[in-house]
Amino acid sequence: MSSSSSHHPEFASCTANDDEHHLDEFELELVVQDVQRQQNNGSANTDQHERENLLLLDDSSKSGALKRRLFFDNLLKNVQDDHIRFLHRQKERIDRVDVKLPAIEVRYNNLSVEAECRTANGDHLPSLWNSTKGAFSGLVKLLGLETERAKINVLEDVSGIIKPCRLTLLLGPPGCGKSTLLRALSGKLDKSLKVTGDISYNGYQLDEFVPEKTAAYISQYDLHIPEMTVRETLDFSSRCQGVGRRPKILKEVSARESAAGIIPDADIDIYMKAISVEASKRSLQTDYILKIMGLEICADTMVGDAMIRGLSGGQKKRLTTAEMIVGPARAYFMDEISNGLDSSTTFQIISCFQQLTNISEYTMVISLLQPTPEVFDLFDDLILMAEGKIIYHGPRNEALNFFEECGFICPERKEVADFLQEILSCKDQQQYWSGPNESYRYISPHELSSMFKENHRGRKLEEPIVSPKSELGKEALAFNKYSLQKLEMFKACGAREALLMKRSMFVYVFKTGQLAIIALVTMSVFLRTRMTTDFTHATYYMGALFFSILMIMLNGTPEISMQIRRLPSFYKQKSYYFYSSWAYAIPASVLKVPVSILDSLVWICITYYGIGYTASVSRFFCQFLMLCFVHQSVTSLYRFIASYFQTPTASFFYLFLALTFFLMFGGFTLPKPSMPGWLNWGFWISPMTYAEIGTVINEFQAPRWQKETIQNITIGNRILINHGLYYSWHFYWISIGALFGSIILFYIAFGLALDYITSIEEYHGSRPIKRLCQEQEKDSNIRKESDGHSNISRAKMTIPVMELPITFHNLNYYIDTPPEMLKQGYPTKRLQLLNNITGALRPGVLSALMGVSGAGKTTLLDVLAGRKTGGYIEGDIRIGGYPKVQETFVRILGYCEQADIHSPQLTVEESVTYSAWLRLPSHVDKKTRSEFVAEVLETVELDQIKDVLVGTPQKNGLSMEQRKRLTIAVELVSNPSVILMDEPTTGLDTRSAAIVIRAVKNICKTGRTVVCTIHQPSTKIFEAFDELILMKNGGKIIYNGPIGERSSKVIEYFEKISGVLKVKSNCNPAAWMMDVTSTSMEVQHNMDFAILYDESSQHRDIVELVEKLSIPIPNSEILSFSHRFPRNGWIQLKACLWKQNLTYWRSPEYNLRRIMLTVISALVYGVLFWKRAKILNDEQDLFNVFGAMYLGSTTIGSYNHQSIIPFSTTERIVMYREKFAGMYSSWSYSFAQAAIEIPYVFIQVVLYTLIIYPSIGYYWTTHKFIWFFYTTFCSSLSYIYVGLLLVSLTPNVQVATILASFFNTMQTLFSGFILPAPQIPKWWVWLYYLTPTSWTLDALLTSQYGNIEKEVRAFGETKSVSIFLNDYFGFHKDKLSLVAAVLIAFPFVLIILFSFSIEKFNFQKR
């Protein structure tokens, strides 16, 4: 993004063919060939300075990165001042040779956007019942409960022009349609929305070119790959977005300069050449964007997420913007890009955008929530929106005149942006009315919009809309979807995939290490010294081969969660045409081939000779090859499933359907001869079939199995015949071919899924008909203003509060220096984030914590709150004069985190009620608590949406600003003595921010200690605070003291410093303060504000205050409570169970799917094993029934514990927050989590038993039926509690999934199904007894057949069934009572371990 990326209409208009819009590769080479030749060959004719500059082009070395950084450090020493000179130097070079830059003019005429939303009678929230109704829509209609759909106008007949060279501000309250307008103008609207009206770029309709490549929409949501650094993210974006027509501009400029004998500016020439090189791995443009966005300090820091330490919220927001502006687009539509940024950083960034717009002729529309006056004045034009209508669109400096004509006047010292948004509110509008109060009536947005259209400004705006098309032509527009050639796209995506695999090395190493451990265990179980070549041991060899295939198949399951994790970023980049789906899919698949080879090699190297397979090198490699193809086949299938279904719950559901199918028709659990003939097709389409055929004929057709005979048939052939796997050797290669075909098929399916399956659409929620009618009548029935803040003040006064000051002295905080920084030459192994912080927070004094993004504000709050889980803390923190005791401090603390973490399946009111229930003292009765909750909801203006589901960020439920207010409400309702708020107004518009701060101010007056980090406060909000702590980069304080009336104390302090500019009249003092204390000002004036503060009287006053407050008040006692938690254990359990019940009831995706899997599995098993329970002639018949029992117990159990992993992980982050707040003990939470599973598991088991029991034909006696139900129920509970335990023991879903597959394989190995208990080596038999499945199969088989005395033929001998069970399996009916006790003991032991793990382990890195 620079002026050199612009295009030239004059020489573009000279071409008649569209082909000439693309730069010929030969012509490009003429421009940069001297640079690249000298870069590669080191020409002797180039001086040293020039050769160093040539390294800037595409040098990925450490020295190259340093040179690129130094290039801009010298060029842009002070970004705010030097950037405009830099752009002017580029502009002067282009203008000097009369190359005019094209521009984009965007017109929209009578644009309307309509969405459909569901309405429903009664409960409108997603639930098991509502989802079931939806699944049976025909029945629902008969019952008169059909779902209705209502049409919502998101945008309503809006028109206007976005002109180049003019920076446009988009203002309006949340929900007014700003994002929809920006998406519409950039061509990014969802296809499900109904759009009418016209949008054109330079006169061309959106369907005549590629708007996604011509313009860039920058979302308010930050979607990035957590494992990549900032620089890597931008380099990849720059590489994929390409260089546009920068080379063409450079070619024309260079040609004209050469003809005129002009020597170009050396720095500008190097810059323009460097950013014109196609497909550059390391771009100088990245360093430019890092510089102007203030991200160079964290350039080599990983982005991170909720579980990985990374960027701050403000840094991540800037990265979202930087990711798009690093490209060559000429029009930008930016949605709330300043959320989480301080006013100084916002001013610097918007200043750069203003300069780019005005000098380099860009087209920009920027939506902001809380622009300061200084930022507001940077804009040329203004669009004001409300309720989907445009209230004003025109020059910024004429907006006040228009509203004066409408009867509204902006008061003195009132910020214009605040005024413009508040006059749209029915609560705030009257205070700005210029006429007599009695003549005032509320003027709705609809009326204001009509008044604007009738005004001369509105009429003037509409006139050119219907004028002829622009003559600027096509030069500024993009007509190709992709910037890179196919090969370059594959290279870019391949390089990134390799990087991400390297960053995920822990997962791969952990997975392979686990495989090696299982291989060693398997080898020792089937040890060659215990295996001989008789028929019985041939069965064991068959089991070992089956287990090897199963293990290799399960080894790839983490691929699902890893793929799902990257899908949001993929869909974002795909929508911007960074790359094609195939460019992503092929590297993501092909680069995993070495993983398949390594895992298969590890397995076979340990097991082949250890187990005692045929000692032949060729057969060794044949088995190895087969396992490689199996691994690739199933992992390709897993990737396809993840890309198609996109959510963990849905993906694991279909994964287990697939695995169930493979196991059923694989030829081992039920041999082919025992299958119903009409189901043989299933045998031939299962990849496991071909894996079985290939491995068993490779082993059992070896010469050693052809010597001894049974009934004139060799042992090898007999075992193959019994399992229906007797095929000639060439079937090995047929199996290889079939598996290879499945790999190609799944590769293609993966690519097609990514290409054609759209990202999961936002869930807009259903709306009750009653509420919809109320909204439609809003214009005629306006709610009267309520004095919510006074209510909350009175309510809080009824609950006693302890007034406690906080002091902190010489507070330091260090973390281990990230490896990326060490590689870049950072000198020390510890990185200091807080540097000798000293201060005091007092009751009744509202303190603001401010500073540039990354200065350490959140870090300071985390240290004070005790939230840090890593790093090194030094210094003294005292509460009420006594050293802080964390266990008691959390009882009086309310901490509003920057990340809004809530349970997605609760409503707004339920979330607040839950917090009040567990955090208010026990003496507060239920009625008072309910009233208190209602008043808090009204205070933060959530009462109107109290029944709305919280939902998942960026997908459904509450908007960003509503989530922020919910975070505040959840903490305020706890009635804390100390409140720490991390950016409580981020994401709120000015009016909502004022409401929140007003409420906080009133709360503070009741004797609470309150501190808020805050960005971009308006003058009114800033002066609502009493004291200020101002920080700079490096975690240092540069001011700590009172703000003063009209900010007099702060202004007085900084104006005394030599070189600091005086504050202007009507200037926002907070913005002025941030501006004059910026790093660039320190460099310009050669000063350090932290040192100046340390030497000031202000600092000495604070030290004295800290010393005074660090001494306990006489006769006071250290803060303590008789109990650790506000509520007793029973109330905790009851509240947690209440919440879990709502969460589970409203999670139909999770619960309905597992019920569906149970029913489907039972039906399929019932058909496959139809009436086989009483067919008992030989050992194979018993093995068939045993296989049915094994499949039934393991399939449903394994799905339960795999599917609960992602489901439980979502709630785990919430649990960390609630547990830190002291809401409940680990035991209460874990017992509630375990208890809520019981009714759902009970339903599963009931359905399974009622279907499978009669289908297979088990014995119909009450005793046997109860035993079957009881065993299946205990087994299912054990499986699901194992899943919960794995979540509590692991840092993320991927590792938990790997351990789950480890558990599954060990369960199978020691269940008695693969190898019966008497044959398990004595050194491993203890694992048999620790395996729940072994007891399950013992109970199932013994309860059915333990008293059956019918004789059967078993391995050439005649025995009764009961004796065979005892001899072969080690099962005896006399042990059933012990088995029953062990079965019920397993769930209880697992619950206790789950509780203990939650108590001891915290994987959240802070």
UniProtKB/Swiss-Prot annotation:
InterPro entries per the UniProt record, alphabetical: AAA+_ATPase (IPR003593), ABC2_TM (IPR013525), ABC_transporter-like_ATP-bd (IPR003439), ABCG_dom (IPR043926), ABCG_PDR_1 (IPR034001), ABCG_PDR_2 (IPR034003), P-loop_NTPase (IPR027417), PDR_assoc (IPR013581)
Residues annotated to bind ATP 2: G851, V852, S853, G854, A855, G856, K857, T858
Main subcellular location of this protein, as a coarse class: membrane
Compartment list: Membrane
Keyword Glycoprotein found: no
Membrane topology field: Multi-pass membrane protein
Gene Ontology cellular-component terms listed: plasma membrane
Superkingdom, natural source: Eukaryota
Residue ranges crossing the lipid bilayer per the database entry: 506-526, 535-555, 593-613, 624-644, 650-670, 734-754, 1155-1175, 1185-1207, 1238-1258, 1265-1285, 1295-1315, 1323-1343, 1378-1398
SUPFAM superfamilies per UniProt: P-loop containing nucleoside triphosphate hydrolases
Binding positions (ATP 1): G172, P173, P174, G175, C176, G177, K178, S179
Family the UniProt entry places it in: Belongs to the ABC transporter superfamily. ABCG family. PDR (TC 3.A.1.205) subfamily.
PANTHER family: ATP-BINDING CASSETTE TRANSPORTER
Functional summary from the UniProt entry: May be a general defense protein.
Protein's recorded name: ABC transporter G family member 50
Organism from which the protein derives: Oryza sativa subsp. japonica
